[in-house]
Design a protein with these regions (language model features):
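Extracytoplasmic substrate-binding proteins
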Residues: 19-102, 127-128, 185-220
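Short acidic/glycine-rich loop or secondary-structure boundary segments that cap or lie
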Residues: 103-107, 116, 158-160
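Residue-level recognition of alpha-helix initiation/capping sites
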Residues: 13-15, 50, 109, 132, ...
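Alpha-helical, coiled-coil/dimerization segments enriched in small aliphatic residues
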Residues: 107-134
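Acidic/His-rich segments in extracytoplasmic proteins that coordinate ligands and/or metal ions
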Residues: 1-62, 137-178, 214
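Acidic/histidine-enriched, beta-strand-rich ligand/metal-binding domains
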Residues: 125-132, 140, 144, 148-149, ...
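Short, conserved, surface-exposed binding loops centered on an aromatic residue
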Residues: 85-90, 117, 140-144
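Internal, well-ordered alpha-helical scaffold/interface segments
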Residues: 57, 74, 112-119, 139
Length: 220
């Protein structure tokens, strides 16, 4: 018997918690994360770090902890303000943010939060530009040849029934002979990143930005 539910748009589907009206009729408040699809897919609305900050501020108002919410958003903005001048006179490293779906690779492109977190952390996207967030093949990845690859994982993540939840997700790239020629492989720039840091990341948004910034520019 909750008083309030904060969740993704998909959480309020018929197969899960049901429509928000069901809860409102029972005096239960609800909030959907802006980047979870409640306004439409990433192809309709660009998902941004700014949206995550707005979620934090809105929830801060709902729970009457505005000062804490504002401090967290200020911390995120402060780190972004540190990263931008550092990169002003540098060529950004090209990056692919991918999720292995067993033969093809989901792209976290520029319209997705993952893509926006990556660029906020100093990446230049090698794939997923101009709203093209469709899956890519191994051949597409080889042709793009990014400087670095970030492989997305989450708890329970498997590929072909093998557990790749955690740092071992990089092996999907580094242990695949087809990718031996990739600059990211040759230069040890294949990294793991948790889905929580690149999708509806909320309070973990800064973790995501720093994941990219610190891996790509360790001297930062």
């Amino acid at each position: 018997e909750p008083d309030f539910i904060a969740a993704w748009y998909s959480t309020f589907s018929d197969k899960r918690l049901g429509d928000v009206d069901f809860w409102h009729e029972r005096s239960v408040g609800t909030y959907m994360a802006l980047n979870s699809g409640c306004r439409g897919g990433s192809g309709t609305y660009q998902q941004t770090v700014a949206d995550e900050c707005q979620d934090i501020l809105t929830l801060g108002m709902i729970f009457d902890v505005q000062d804490r919410a504002e401090a967290l958003v200020a911390e995120i903005q402060g780190e972004l303000d540190n990263i931008s001048p550092y990169l002003a006179d540098k060529d950004r490293l090209t990056v692919a943010v991918l999720e292995d779906e067993g033969g093809t690779y989901r792209v976290y492109g520029e319209d997705t939060l993952g893509g926006n977190v990556a660029t906020s952390g100093g990446a230049e996207l090698a794939v997923g530009k101009h709203g093209d967030n469709g899956n890519i093949s191994a051949e597409d990845l080889i042709a793009a040849n990014p400087d670095a690859i970030f492989m997305v994982w989450y708890n329970g993540y498997t590929v072909n029934d093998t557990d790749y939840a955690g740092e071992q997700v990089v092996e999907l790239i580094t242990e695949n002979p087809a990718f031996a020629s990739l600059d990211a492989v040759k230069n040890d720039r294949v990294f793991a990143i948790n889905l929580n840091n690149v999708y509806c990341s909320g309070m973990r948004t800064l973790d995501g930005v720093l994941d990219f910034a610190q891996h790509l520019y360790p001297e930062l």
